[in-house]
């Protein structure tokens, strides 16, 4: 990337805003200043910071920055009759909107489902709104971990960089949702979830669950890497 701290999806927006800034200053200082502020806001929205990711294939980590709006036992979206725990993370317009792989493994499914653009903070948005559903078979335990990138009122563009057959590392970048959104992670039944409603999560860093049920003292404080 030319600008490592900005996601490439933001380049067109920033470029247009910058051109308008130059034109604006040609007419008046005030107009140029307005467009300059818009340029800075675009750069802030599409920021793409590195994260310090735990090196542990047994973990499920948060795929996004945001607030946990619900932790609920629901039916698996890919296996009828099988119950899983859904962790829903709401991203406000101020959060980093780059999404990260919550688990290490192999991508088994990527599907786009059209829908509405209702507020992403509601549970109904999961089934009604436009979304991209991905399934990663975990390196540890061969669990099918489902991730849903859900559109919202302002989030009209979901970008998922995953492709079936890809091997992904824990915390690696997997896409972005533009302008406010929601991400759901489905944790296998029997795996304790380590976050609750109201928790603020950091994408690529906050641990949601440990797939190794024999580890009772939490995940080991072993090694981390910048991703």
From Swiss-Prot:
CC annotations in GO: plasma membrane
Membrane topology of the entry: Peripheral membrane protein
Subcellular compartments: Cell membrane
Catalytic activities: a 1,2-diacyl-sn-glycero-3-phospho-L-serine + H(+) = a 1,2-diacyl-sn-glycero-3-phosphoethanolamine + CO2
One Gene Ontology term from the biological process aspect of the record: phosphatidylethanolamine biosynthetic process
Pathway connected to this protein: Phospholipid metabolism; phosphatidylethanolamine biosynthesis; phosphatidylethanolamine from CDP-diacylglycerol: step 2/2
Cofactors required: pyruvate
EC number: 4.1.1.65
Positions of the record's site feature: Cleavage (non-hydrolytic): 180-181
Keywords carried by this UniProt record: Cell membrane, Decarboxylase, Lipid biosynthesis, Lipid metabolism, Lyase, Membrane, Phospholipid biosynthesis, Phospholipid metabolism, Pyruvate, Zymogen
Pyruvic acid (Ser): modified positions: 181
Enzyme superclass (EC): lyase
Membrane listed as a keyword: yes
Entry note: cofactor: Binds 1 pyruvoyl group covalently per subunit.
Major location category of this protein: membrane
Post-translational modification summary for this protein: Is synthesized initially as an inactive proenzyme. Formation of the active enzyme involves a self-maturation process in which the active site pyruvoyl group is generated from an internal serine residue via an autocatalytic post-translational modification. Two non-identical subunits are generated from the proenzyme in this reaction, and the pyruvate is formed at the N-terminus of the alpha chain, which is derived from the carboxyl end of the proenzyme.
Active site annotation, chain numbering: 181
An example molecular function term from Gene Ontology annotations: phosphatidylserine decarboxylase activity
Domain of life: Bacteria
Family to which this protein belongs: Belongs to the phosphatidylserine decarboxylase family. PSD-A subfamily.
Subunit record text: Heterodimer of a large membrane-associated beta subunit and a small pyruvoyl-containing alpha subunit.
Role this protein plays: Catalyzes the formation of phosphatidylethanolamine (PtdEtn) from phosphatidylserine (PtdSer).
Name of the molecule in the record: Phosphatidylserine decarboxylase proenzyme
Organism of this sequence: Anaplasma phagocytophilum (strain HZ)
Lineage of the organism: Bacteria, Pseudomonadati, Pseudomonadota, Alphaproteobacteria, Rickettsiales
